[in-house]
Amino acid sequence: MENLSERFNALQEQLMNIYEAAEQTLKAQILHWQTLRKEAVTLYFARQKGINRLGYQPVPALAISEARAKEAIYMVLQLESLQKSAFALEPWTLVDTSTETFKSAPENHFKKGPVPVEVIYDKDEANANLYTMWTFVYYMDSDDVWHKTTSGVNQTGIYYLYGTFKHYYVLFADDAKRYSATGEWEVKVNKETVFTPVTSSTPPGSPGGQTDPDTSSKTPTTTTAATDTSPRRQSINKQSQQTETKRRGYGRRPSSRTRRPQTHQRRSRSRSRSRSSSQTHSSTTTTTTTYRSRSTSLNKTRARSRSRSTSRSTSTTSRRGGRGSSTRQRSRSPSTYTSKRSREGNTRGRGRGRQGRAGSSGGREQRRRRRSFSTSPDSSKRVRRESPKYRGVSPSEVGKQLRSVGAKHSGRLGRLLEEARDPPVILVRGDANTLKCFRNRARNKYRGLFRSFSTTFSWVAGDSIERLGRSRMLISFSCLTQRRDFDDAVKYPKGVEWSYGSLDSL
């Protein structure tokens, strides 16, 4: 207990000496953060031992001491990296290397020379907001090389130059949505107006009014596809319409008016032909009538009900008169009979029991014929040939599926073809240094759970060379299962955002 208090007092004394000396060197700033790290470790150890006070200093919770120690370690690493650059001999104060300055916008950058920027909304002096523009900004590129750049302000926002690009870290249009009623603001630097009131309707090329790049790129493509009248395009559209019609399942089919004259012609033939030929035409007519529209089916249903009532009376006559009555039935007017009645007339003289069974099984026989027609070998082969499951995946379909592959595919080939439509990736957004550190850790810690990492990159405005938003990085995977395993195991750094996506090729 006493030794721990003595060590803590020694660290406090060393910190006081650093504050009194106020040296403006990187070496002094590194020593300052190393001392803060030792202090946090001492307080953490004291809390573990159940000590609540070290002298007059209360011991904080373990989580607080741990966070302070990690923060000090991170700042030491950044300052040691800056010490190896060409800016090590510049003057660096405690304010320049503090966490408050380092984490202010633009985040995770060393900055010097704050300049106040006042933005007045709706021409109201009381409705104003203050921002900080930094004269110099120090950033590290993708090759871990430090650069020094200047910062500026315009009607869009406050930015710093990343090479030749303008990287905005403050956008006035974002705050205008909250503070402004008319969407107008005025920019003042050091109490001097540098930009007169402007509206929030900025041009599409600027970051404040940037439109969705996918919308501008997809619109002409859709128009071209719609106006293309080449024979190849027409044949493809016709095939797609046929495939779409077959996938409707049991939906309503369009009524085919061209089949009615053909059906009428077949009926007229069945009236004039013999008893055997009428049976053949009656089955064809029944099959054709089954696939008519709903209105035609209603009319035929009524006709069937009338034919059944007529057939019952006729069957009674056949039972009374024997075989001679069936001969009289064939000599009657053809307009009273359909092809279905001619088929029923063959069984009227065979006895009462068989006649009853034939009448009751008429509906089931019709359903069996309908089922056999829909599941015929030709139709099943035709659907199987046109099904994309057995045709493979065309280049235009790769990456277009939005849902993950389910368990409906029993074969391995079908699952591989479905997964080929959606090569999975993860888009990570954050600070460039944070993303690079995360990439280096993930390569060793999560080996085998990913395919590859990309370098950091940024989006550029449509009509300019200004960088938009934070840095990006892509993580590719071999399949959706690998991406899910990676997402379950990985722990992203603080402030890093991610989203799912897919690409046509990697």
UniProtKB/Swiss-Prot annotation:
Q: Which InterPro entries match?
A: E2/EBNA1_C_sf, Nucleotide-bd_a/b_plait_sf, Papillomavirus_E2_C, PPV_E2_N, Reg_prot_E2, Regulatory_protein_E2_N, Regulatory_protein_E2_N_1, Regulatory_protein_E2_N_2
Q: Among its keywords, does the record have Signal?
A: no
Which portions of the sequence form the region DNA-binding domain?
422-506
Q: Where is the composition biased (Low complexity)?
A: 196-229, 275-297, 310-339
Q: How is it modified after translation?
A: Phosphorylated.
Compartments it resides in: Host nucleus
For this chain, one GO molecular function annotation is: DNA binding
Basic residues bias locations: 248-274
Which keywords does UniProt give here?
Answer: Activator, DNA replication, DNA-binding, Early protein, Host nucleus, Phosphoprotein, Repressor, Transcription, Transcription regulation
> Where is this chain compositionally biased, Polar residues type?
232-243
Q: Region Transactivation domain: which residues?
A: 1-201
Q: Name one GO biological process term.
A: viral DNA genome replication
Q: Basic and acidic residues: which segments have biased composition?
A: 379-389
**Membrane-crossing residues?**
none
Q: Name one GO cellular component term.
A: host cell nucleus
Cited Pfam families:
PPV_E2_C, PPV_E2_N
State the oligomer form and interacting partners. Answer: Binds DNA as homodimer. Interacts with protein E1; this interaction greatly increases E1 DNA-binding activity. Interacts with protein L1; this interaction enhances E2-dependent replication and transcription activation. Interacts with protein L2; this interaction inhibits E2 transcriptional activity but not DNA replication function E2. Interacts with protein E7; this interaction inhibits E7 oncogenic activity. Interacts with host TAF1; this interaction modulates E2-dependent transcriptional regulation. Interacts with host BRD4; this interaction mediates E2 transcriptional activation function.
Q: Which family does this protein fall into? A: Belongs to the papillomaviridae E2 protein family.
What protein name is recorded for this chain? Regulatory protein E2
Question: What species is given as this protein's source?
Answer: Human papillomavirus 47
